Amino acid sequence: MKHLWFFLLLVAAPRWVLSQVQLQESGPGLVKPSETLSLTCTVSGYSISSGYYWGWIRQPPGKGLEWIGSIYHSGSTYYNPSLKSRVTISVDTSKNQFSLKLSSVTAADTAVYYCAR
């Protein structure tokens, strides 16, 4: 029984640790057409440099979630093909933050933006 208990703790620990992770978006609430939207996500409770992909998603009014892109702590990026030409995601491990820049915004970019892991 001791072995089973240890195994359960070992499996459960990573989930417990990750449950303490908090992400907080910051940036302007409004951006004018043709301007660049800049958002920053500050991570607490976990070091970005320890791994995992970090990303941005958005939800236009009355629609579902749309993946914008993701970044690994090393700087490797992956973007939604439909937004790739306008999106830049970067990471600053020294500040434990990652950022989104979306250029040439239009009314079609109206959405609630979220950072995620």
Swiss-Prot record:
Residues 1-19 form the signal peptide. It is found in: Secreted; Cell membrane. Residues 45-53 are annotated as: Complementarity-determining-1. Pfam families: V-set (PF07686). Keywords: Adaptive immunity, Cell membrane, Disulfide bond, Immunity, Immunoglobulin, Immunoglobulin domain, Membrane, Secreted, Signal. GO terms for cellular component: extracellular region; immunoglobulin complex; plasma membrane. Residues 54-70 are annotated as: Framework-2. Disulfide bonds join 41-115. One of its GO terms (molecular function) is antigen binding. PROSITE patterns: IG_LIKE. This is Immunoglobulin heavy variable 4-38-2.
